[in-house]
Structure formats: structure tokens, C-alpha cells
Amino acid sequence: MATEDLALLPIDIQDTETAGAFISFLEPFLPFSCGLIGLTQSHLTSQPDPYLKAWATFDFNYRSTSEVPKLFTVAVFTPIQGRLFCSADTSPEDVTAEELIHRERVVRLYVVTATSLIQTLPGHEEDSEYLLGVVHEKFFPLVKPYAGDAPTPPYRLFFCPPPDTEVIKTTVTGPDTSRWLVTGLEESDLELVRSTSHFQRTIEYLRTRIPTSACIRDPDSADGRRPVAWLMKHLDGSMGALYVDPDYRGKRLGALVVSECIKRLGENSVPDKFSWSTSTKFHPRFSEFFNHLEGWEAGWRTWWVRLDVVKHGRVVHRAIN
């Protein structure tokens, strides 16, 4: 498809078979597609979301292997946030002229599409912004002009291979669990979890993360269940909210809770193809932690961008049409 004819073609993501094929199609591009896969899976496995939308720059619904172009982009929209993934994200090479034009066109089309969809959401406000998450460093310069507020500082994405590989087995069996009680988070823990987070999260949201969490407890505490370290898998598939009580640091509880969370997820559901997390430069301890955590690798830079879809969506729509 010529760049001037490029379009975001809808994917019937509400169809179970098509949704499964969509995830399977993206898996060979892991870990670069992890943000998009995680967000899509969460909205497919939880209560069905009629507002989940997906597109590709080729006709995914009627594709064959020979028809998938080398350069393509897939995109996802949910009421909370969106994702973009370009096949060229996997390349260490600089952005080519062809790729630059492709990405620029995709971003413009996505802003227009998101603008239209946001206006259909319950509780829509005229001045709404829309969060585009885990924006790859190759996409960021093209997304930035559409931002409302200043984008977040860059986040480094860290990823870990699948639980059934040899490298992760070393991590999972690393710290000794015998001294500690390992559980998931519980309702009574949520206020503490919220109060220790750098990000504002509701109790309602944290409650949905209980099944995807791990919590290390001190059996020698007064009630025998004091939570001293925890981690959860977020809605987009990332591992986050990692916290270790200051009184218990230096005991490798961070590494323990990461490995236990991955194990619990593998026991309770289909194991993730990749585990991943992000860290900003303003949390150097977090970055240092993952840099030294066996089995984990530092990846590329990403950003979280709040698109001013009302302002820029109308402008872009006029420019395209």
C-alpha cells in the first residue's frame, strides 16, 4: 500500500477467533509488542469491552502470510489508553525516510480515530485528553506535537524471557522463601499499597489487581501477616507497584517478590510470553534493581503521552481530508 493511500483498517477484535489470531500474530515480535499484547489481553479476558478497538495498516481480517507487508503498524484503543506498534520497532537501525512518512501518517490517523471514539464514551468531556502508553522512542517525536500536557520523562523498558526458559528458572529459584510467607495481596492491604505508590490509583483499580499480585509477609510480625514487599501485574500487562518496606530492605525481597509474582501468574493462568516493566530516570533504584535482576534485560526508551485529541484531532482531520 502506497504511503499516500495508507489507512487504519479495522480488525474484528470482538470476535474470539480473530482476537486470538491477533495476539498470535504479534507474539513473534515480542518483546517489542508486549505493551500492545498485554493491554489487548486484559480487555479480552476480563469483562467484554465493547469499546476495545484494533486496526492495522493492512487488511488483517483477510490476510495471508504473503500479504503482510514488511513495514506495517497495528494500533489498539481502549477507553483508558491506547497503543501503537510498528514492525520497524524491532530494528536497531535508524528510522528510514519511508518509515518516517509511514509513522507520521499513522499517528495522524490515530489521533483522528481516537477523537471520534472518545466522543462516544460514557462520561465524555469536551476537553478530554487521551493517554497513549508505552510509546516507542521511534514513534515519540511524531506523537509529541499532539500532546496536551508535557509528556512524561522517558521510561526504560525492562523485559524478561518466558518462565519456561532456563534463564528465568535461575531467577525463580533464587531468594530463599522459607523465612517468609508468600501470598497474594488482600483487601486489607490495599490502602497501604495505595499510600506507598508514586502514582495515584484508586482502591477499585487495585482490587482488580489482587489476582495478579504477589505479597511477601513476615510471619514473625505481631499478627504473623505483615506485608513487607509486593508487586502486581497491571492492566496493560506490565509488572508494577513494586515496593519493599524500608525496614526490610537489603534482604533480596525485591527479587523474591518478582519471581513469586511470575510463578503465581504461571500457576493461575496462561504464563506470559514475556514479563516486562518500565522505570523512569527519576527512580534510579528501580532501574538499578532490574539491571541487576538475573534474567531481565534493559530495552528501549518509552514515553506516556496524553494526546490533546479535541484540539489536534480536529486540525488533523481537516488536514487529512
Regions found by a protein language model. Name each.
Residues 201-247:
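A conserved beta-strand-loop-helix scaffold within acyl/acetyltransferase catalytic domains
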Residues 2-38, 164-203:
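Short amphipathic alpha-helix that is part of the acyltransferase structural core
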Residues 42-177, 302-319:
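Acyl-donor-binding surface of acyltransferase catalytic domains
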